[in-house]
Amino acid sequence: MSAISIMFFVLAFYTVSSDYVGPQKDISNCSSDNKLEVICNFKNPEDIVITPDKKFLFMSEFGGIGPYEEQKSGYFALLDLKTRTKIIPNITIEENIWGDPKCSRTTNKKHGPHGIDLVKRNDGRYQLGVINHYPDETIEMFEMIKKKDSWDMVWRGCINVPYEFYFNDISLKRDGTFYASHMYDRDITLNRWLFISIIKTNTGFLIEWSDNKFKKVEGSDGSGPNGIALDENSNIIYINYNQGDSITKFDLLSNKKLDKKF
């Protein structure tokens, strides 16, 4: 690497880290204070939803993705809001009824969860959608089943993700179809990612999955699409363009960006 490349890398890293990380409090000793309550024993909690009974937080424990680090496995966890303790959910494998029949999973296959979403389906069941990066790029579907002191996960199917997409987050509809945010190319380098974080060019867009097909949502292009949240009743989806430094309100009927913040 040349001296100029090194200088550029350091400058880009400093700029991006200042924008996205900011000041951090040392919580390595897992001690709370009068401003911050620290709950220990969780590993890389990435995305969080509250369970239907409002008694637990369910979360994905992120493994890792490129270009920041090597892809590796993670898992899932529940936080009991009353006892402040961690619970590892039980997972069982059943018939694939909510995914692509060509996609399969075995009991011993590891998980690499990223973005998640939980919705009450039209049939009354609770469906959890998971963006999964390990060992393969898939969308995993689970039914959440209430138990006495926890929630269990029943695998109900998956969808293989084509190489052209690299997903971050998912928003489910009540009929089992969904939207997902495509971040950027899978083979993006760290230098390229840092450069985009400075110049804010478009890298990805929103994808809709229905009729067992992925389809781009026109007009949703932006820099680093990240977290998304769907209001199905109004056909509005909120998109966090991470590298673009904005949260955008997007109309799914007109395929137009209505408003943005930051």
Region annotations inferred by a language model:
Residues 63-66, 71-122:
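Blade-loop segments of beta-propeller domains
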